[in-house]
Design a protein with these regions (language model features):
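N-terminal pre-Walker A segment at the start of P-loop NTPase domains
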Residues: 1-16
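Phosphate-binding P-loop
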Residues: 17-23, 295-298
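Phosphate-binding glycine-rich loops of NTP-binding sites
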Residues: 24-61, 287-288, 336-339
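ABC ATPase nucleotide-binding domain "signature" loop
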Residues: 30-33, 307-313, 342
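Conserved P-loop NTP-binding catalytic core
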Residues: 41-109
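Electropositive, glycine-dotted interaction segments
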Residues: 91-242
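Conserved ABC ATPase signature
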Residues: 234-295, 302-318
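C-terminal lobe/lid and adjacent interdomain/linker elements of RecA-like ASCE P-loop ATPase modules
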Residues: 321-406
């Protein structure tokens, strides 16, 4: 399975400069304001970029100036490189190729591409770089690879070319395979369980291609699974029953008044009464969304979940962590958490600590050394072995051994 194994990011929001490897499971911890949300926001931007909606995302994010590290007076571009390899903590980060972009602000507060490059393996086994438009060539020498060449693109375009790019026939398969790895990166956020949340409303029956980021089409998606993927549906139902024993089953059907509509309904043991989504607790409703996401048959290549522990009982967190581990054999997961109990369910290699580092250097008019930034740290079992003989990961977090405390 191809995973996003290595990422370099510069100039994005609180992230001045980041270079880090990623594994099958990545659990981000850190205090409020450290930069977890900004890291997740980068993937939101990437997803919108690949979908052809970069400028809309920039506008909704407050403009280019708000997206650059301390604004355009300090930072003149956002630079990112993403590389793909085999899953696991021991891997060749560059094995399958990569994707590189540089975005710079315009006078009207938009972002435009300075460059956009797909890195791919040439049939001769060297890793080549293919620009997405014709132009001059120049040599590149990344540390991880040899014999690199770059076909530089023209620059100046406002939306990504990778999704619709058609390379030369001789290179088609190699480049197409890398282009297919670039997204989608969907951030799932099941926080809204208010009375007006989409998850509680009647929705379109046929809106079932994928589970929406807010689980707004949960009823339609579950109905599709019931009809086409009964095994996965039963896994979801079983998971819900483990944390909500009186739950018998979902009672999913097209609306009698409009056969193109559907609403989330359910039943409990010993009764034929149909309950609605408003009669589920917030935590139970979120858990149903999470179970559906992680137990579906066709997982997105990379899943990002923001604070999945909200409203869940400790026993539900254990079950959720088990589903995360199971899903990690078919997809890559990036999670943020503030829960000590949830953190205890994972391995040291899964943990990434994010902290805010404020420089002690004075900030002057001609220097930016005094500005703060988000700093990322990975952990491993070897360095924590002695600690883990006596303490859990959660306790080490509370003791600030892992960092990530206010």
């Amino acid at each position: 399975m191809a995973e996003l194994t290595h990422i370099t990011l510069k100039g994005f929001k609180s992230i001045k400069e980041l270079e880090i490897g990623l594994g099958p499971i990545n659990v981000l911890i850190g205090p409020n304001g450290a930069g977890k949300s900004n890291f997740i926001s980068f993937f939101r931007m990437l997803n919108e970029l690949i979908e052809g909606h970069l400028q809309l995302f920039v506008a909704r994010s407050g403009g280019a100036n708000a997206m650059l590290h301390y604004g355009t007076k300090v930072t003149n571009s956002i630079d990112a490189e993403l590389y793909f390899g085999r899953g696991g903590h021991e891997h060749d980060s560059y094995e399958y190729g990569g994707y590189q972009i540089q975005l710079t602000p315009t006078e009207d507060d938009k972002l435009v591409f300075v460059k956009e490059i797909l890195h791919f393996k040439h049939p001769t086994e060297s890793l080549d770089n293919e620009g997405l438009e014709s132009g001059h060539k120049k040599a590149l020498t990344p540390e991880e690879c040899k014999n690199l060449s770059e076909e530089a693109m023209g620059g100046g375009h406002t939306e990504a070319l990778a999704p619709r790019w058609r390379p030369e026939e001789s290179m088609f398969d190699e480049i197409k395979n890398v282009a297919a790895m670039v997204g989608p990166w969907i951030v799932y956020h099941f926080h809204d369980t208010s009375s007006t949340a989409r998850i509680k409303q009647t929705g379109d029956l046929h809106e079932n291609d994928r589970l929406e980021p807010d689980a707004g089409n949960l009823a339609a998606f579950l109905y599709m699974l019931h009809e086409r993927h009964s095994r996965n549906y039963e896994l979801i139902r079983s998971a819900v029953r483990r944390i909500f024993p009186r739950f018998k089953d979902f009672a999913l059907r097209p609306s009698p008044l409009n056969l193109d509509k559907i609403r989330l309904e359910w039943q409990e043991h010993g009764s034929d009464y149909r309950f609605g989504p408003h009669q589920l607790s917030d935590g139970t409703l979120r858990f149903i969304g999470l179970a559906t996401l992680l137990l579906q048959p066709n997982l997105p290549s990379t899943i990002l979940i923001d604070e999945p522990e909200l409203g869940l009982h400790p026993s539900a967190l254990t079950l959720l962590a088990g589903m995360v581990r199971s899903a990690s054999s078919r997809a890559q997961l990036i999670l943020t958490t503030q829960s000590v109990s949830f953190l205890n369910e994972f391995e040291p290699e899964d943990i990434i600590t994010i902290e805010r580092r404020d420089s002690t250097a004075p900030l002057t008019s001609d220097s930016h050394d005094g500005l703060g930034e988000s700093v990322f740290s990975k952990h491993d079992g070897k360095s924590l072995k002695e600690w883990l003989n006596a303490y859990s990961l959660g306790e080490l977090w509370e003791m600030n051994v892992l960092g990530g405390r206010p």
